[in-house]
Regions:
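Active-site regions of oxyanion-processing enzymes, predominantly non-cytosolic
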Residues: 2-9, 110-117, 148-173, 177-235, ...
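Core domains of carbohydrate- and sulfate-ester-processing enzymes
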Residues: 111-165, 215-252, 312-313, 318-320, ...
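Polar, surface-exposed loop/tail segments
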Residues: 30, 60, 106, 174, ...
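Active-site-proximal N-terminal segment of extracellular/periplasmic enzymes that hydrolyze or transfer
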Residues: 1-44, 48-50
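A short beta-strand-to-alpha-helix junction
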Residues: 3, 26-29, 73-79, 258-270, ...
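Conserved small/polar residues in nucleotide/adenosyl-binding loops
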Residues: 481-486
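Catalytic-site neighborhoods of secreted/periplasmic enzymes
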Residues: 57-178
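Histidine-centered active-site microenvironments of extracellular/periplasmic hydrolases
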Residues: 28, 217-233, 281-340, 346-347
């Protein structure tokens, strides 16, 4: 009897490739992600086509592009998910998650799974602990007064109060945490391992683990255990775990931004630790030779200027630059040559076809993504010529081997610039200096990409037509061209 094939997808929300050793970070500690890359396949050019959280998961679960048709919406009756396709087959399906957006009322993203387990309390679900009084934590200890004044002057007092109220609700739970194992990612992966220990080995299984970490709040163990941050041990200021979403330099000093990034880095390392716990359990249970393991993320994280982004802190603008749209994905598959680094363009809608192909279900005819098994096995060199990304009704982008093109839709609140092209192979020093002055202020040297914008725009719109895209691309002809900052 053949050993049943199984699949595990582990989602780390808001995981930036810039904070992973195998993606080129030389100072962070991510030994288990690095181990997974050595044992599996690392995808260098994976882009989330529909941003952010919910559209990405819809694409991953259904294998269909979301950007041309819709944004933050519920699953429809016409959507066919991986769990739907497993139904009626001898495949046990389970969802273990702490991402509140996966269970929004009436959205239906948990449908089809045989077993569902949810951990309360993360950002957007913090109200679950509203009734618990704060005893020994004070929310003001985590917000710098000067930064709050700057943010309030720019965004309004009500916006600041809402963020602090959310943070206070989060602290209502965090005040009881005492060890790294109290963090959401630890509890979620421990529950997933519990499922693996109990599942019937004579049947196939599909397990989706959805960790909202390392999404903000960036509250790693050092912040609630009274310890120095291991990546910034000399810091004497406040641990601003819920950064104010704005143009970074308008609110924070560079020293503050550095510490915020180091809190995030510590949380990434904690996620890595629990990835290792999962990998060890898979090996201990003898599942390595029969189980596809995919570590995925929905998007990266804008965190300032230069190498960290285009001037933003968090997703406060719908700008699909590399630091947001590019996501780290590593897959380990039995029978596939380990240690590969694949440069071919891959997208969030490729998850469902890959999982279904591996499980033997076959790629559903409604799926627009591609199974990546032929790519991983070396049977093909690529599955597409370019990638797309963006926010439905706000912005979209196309990424080719040489150029990226970003297009903003008309929206007075979000569109300081409307168009930009980025050359993939050049990062001029003066461009980085311009970004340091202001997130979207760019020098005239960038104009060299102007002739590339129109054909890239045309290619994108033609592609949207093949995906039954809706009419949403009405723009003011305001142009700005820049060299791409990778």
């Amino acid at each position: 009897m053949d050993t049943p094939k199984n699949a595990i997808v582990l989602m780390f929300d808001t995981l930036s490739a810039k904070y992973i050793g195998c993606y080129g970070n030389g100072w962070i500690k991510t030994p288990n992600m690095d181990r997974l890359a050595r044992e599996g396949v690392l995808f260098e050019n994976w882009y989330t086509e529909g941003l952010p959280t919910v559209p990405c998961r819809r694409a991953m679960l259904t294998g269909r592009y979301t950007l041309p048709q819709s944004g933050w919406v519920a699953l429809s009756m016409d959507d066919t998910t991986i769990a739907d396709l497993c139904w009626g087959r001898p495949i046990d399906t389970a969802l273990v998650f702490d991402c509140p957006m996966f269970r929004l009322p009436k959205f239906g993203y948990t449908r089809g799974f045989d077993k569902v387990w949810f951990l309360h309390g993360h950002e957007a679900d913090e109200h679950f602990f509203d009734g618990d009084p704060l005893i020994h934590m004070d929310v003001d200890d985590y917000f710098d007064e000067t930064s709050c004044e700057k943010y309030s002057a720019r965004s309004g007092k009500e916006a600041l109060e809402a963020i602090k109220a959310m943070s206070a609700s989060l602290l209502s739970e965090v005040q009881y945490w005492k060890t790294p194992e109290d963090r959401y990612v630890a509890k979620t992966i421990k529950k997933a391992v519990e499922y693996l220990r109990q599942v019937d080995r004579n049947k196939q299984f599909f397990l989706w683990i959805d960790s909202f970490d390392p999404h903000e709040p960036w509250l790693p163990p050092s912040t609630y255990m009274g310890l120095p941050c291991p990546y910034d041990p000399d810091w004497k200021g406040k641990d601003e775990f819920m950064p104010l979403p704005d143009i970074a330099n308008e609110v924070y000093t560079e020293e503050q931004l550095h510490h915020i990034r180091m809190l995030y880095a510590e949380l990434v390392t904690l996620c890595d630790t629990w990835l290792g716990h999962l990998m060890d359990a898979i090996r201990e249970l003898g599942l390595e030779s029969s189980t596809l393991l995919m570590m995925v993320s929905d998007h990266g994280s804008p965190q300032g200027n230069g190498e960290w982004g285009h001037g933003l802190m968090r997703k406060c603008r719908p700008w699909p630059y590399e630091e947001l749209a590019r996501a780290p994905v590593i897959a380990r598959c039995p029978g596939v040559k380990p240690g590969q680094r694949i440069k071919a363009f891959t997208q969030s809608c490729d998850v469902a076809p890959t999982v279904c192909d591996w499980l033997g279900i076959g790629v559903h005819p409604d799926m627009q993504g591609k199974s990546l098994l032929p790519l991983m096995r070396g049977e093909v060199d690529k599955v597409r010529d370019f990638a797309i990304a963006g926010y439905y009704d706000y912005s979209w982008a196309i990424y080719t081997e040489d150029w990226s093109y970003i297009h903003w839709l008309t929206d007075a609140e979000t569109a300081e610039v409307m168009r930009a092209t980025f050359y993939s192979k050049s990062v001029p020093k003066e461009h980085l200096e311009a970004l340091g002055r202001k997130g979207f202020a760019l020098d005239q040297d960038a104009m060299k990409g102007a002739d590339k914008a129109e054909p890239l725009e045309g290619k994108t719109l033609t592609y949207f037509d093949t995906l039954d895209g809706k009419e949403q691309w009405t723009c003011t002809p305001c142009l700005l061209y820049t060299s791409r900052c990778v």
